């Protein structure tokens, strides 16, 4: 685990302990049970793939630790509507506050504003967080293999499946991919960003995609800025992408989303 991830785990453990003190697990489970059924995150992406279309997980992200504030006029419901109108298949919403200025209500309000399934984008370490995610309306959780041991990853995955949620398993290298493929989730995200250096290289996805059989649905994460980037990864069998910052920086998010997916304009090229 990198120093960055160790720091994140430390504050997450403190957050989780405080949350458990505020809302006991049984109360949280009741809140999760009161939610409407998950919308089918994997199913939405698989439907796009099966129609021969690109699938986009469009991210609602206010800030990042490496870039600082990304979008000053940050309105999660309006962004969700723009993404849906532009052709996104799913949402990803940051709920981590210390590093990304995220919040639970961003997820809840974004999902309420559109029909798309939503991922809780956060650092997951405890099954309590899985119940949190469902109570907030999430349809999917993220497991970052760089921050989890195999037993912890399996336990979190099982908790999500028991709630009818999907799981996006994120990897960055071959060792993490091998571990991810021992889990049950068909959704595997390849993060092209090195968490040690923050450098981004699409070749990471191209290398790791060769390790994966057709029964998994691969997601290219980080470094996808243009329709041409999508076409490049398509050659390696990746037709689903998680994109945040490049869309968040655009004035017309709907048009930028459409351009990314269809190549209908050059709006994505100017960063």
From Swiss-Prot:
Keywords: Amino-acid biosynthesis, Aromatic amino acid biosynthesis, Decarboxylase, Lyase, Tryptophan biosynthesis. InterPro entries: Aldolase_TIM (IPR013785), Indole-3-glycerol_P_synth (IPR045186), Indole-3-glycerol_P_synth_dom (IPR013798), Indole-3-GlycerolPSynthase_CS (IPR001468), RibuloseP-bd_barrel (IPR011060). One of its GO terms (biological process) is L-tryptophan biosynthetic process. Pathway: Amino-acid biosynthesis; L-tryptophan biosynthesis; L-tryptophan from chorismate: step 4/5. PROSITE patterns: IGPS. It is an enzyme of class 4 (lyase). SUPFAM superfamilies: Ribulose-phoshate binding barrel. This is Indole-3-glycerol phosphate synthase. The lineage of its organism: Bacteria, Pseudomonadati, Pseudomonadota, Alphaproteobacteria, Hyphomicrobiales.
